[in-house]
């Protein structure tokens, strides 16, 4: 019989909540997964993201329960402590945002620890710079980096990229997760775009999709069509089955009528050897509408000037995509609880400093 049960209420940004239906198909999938899993063969996982995000709750916590694997939880991200835990607890996997695995790879004390058990380098919640993929693979012996894409509204279901596919397509968040998740691209009128590499909004159809926003029918209708497809709010395209994210619809910077993808600019900046962290965003500007900004954390013992970075980016980006305002320092960038960079806080800093 069909069961219509309120399973979870997730709240984010302090103002929005959602609920999700669970029917027999969900329960059966969980049961099948549990039956197929042998706890003694499951490596321990380092859990370093909050449980109030689906990456932490679903990909980390619930899947660990289903698989019967040991889960080591960190109350706050600390790469030095994480390295110690990986050694002491024989951690085999990590689930978190991509910056966390990068923190481990570039930590000055990494070689002091026995990390031989550390193999599964999962990431989600934010893009991983393509050039980091091979560096992670080479830096952790016999490891397998992976990246996933999903949203709170899809209960983390979406795409997955791992193994040779990830090495060959490091800029992609992967293919749709089989067998029940479908991913498509639409235009602003809900027309599906079948041509490869045509940019539109990413939509996801899956039994894992939420029922809707709690007590907000209008907002729910805005993101679903009659066939159950959910509008992600992310711009992207599909090429040979692989999904590529261009940017959040709301995070595109529009400068003098030109659309600028923050992810594209960040990817170019991350290719500079001195850059540890980078966040690109826009702030209001009277004449052009928005000014493109970047905040950068430089690697320890490395140096980087604004002019050096501008010169470096000249043959990688169109002139209008090179940030006009730069903040280059050795301090880590501010983050929200999920581990992502807080671009809202960075915008406020730039505006309050009179950088516009």
Where are the regions a protein language model picked out?
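Conserved AMP-binding/adenylation subdomain of ANL enzymes
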Residues: 6-47, 52-93, 107
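Gly/Ser/Thr-rich phosphate-binding loop
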Residues: 66-67, 83, 88-96, 105-168, ...
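AMP-binding/adenylate-forming catalytic core of the ANL superfamily
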Residues: 94, 183, 206, 211-212, ...
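Glycine-centered tight turns that cap/initiate beta-strands
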Residues: 109, 117, 142, 179, ...
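Active-site glycine-centered loops adjacent to acidic/histidine catalytic or metal-binding residues
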Residues: 125, 150, 174, 234, ...
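Conserved ATP/PPi-binding loop(s) of AMP-dependent carboxylate-activating enzymes
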Residues: 175-180, 191-223, 258-260
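Acidic/polar alpha-helix N-cap and adjacent early helical turns
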Residues: 348-356
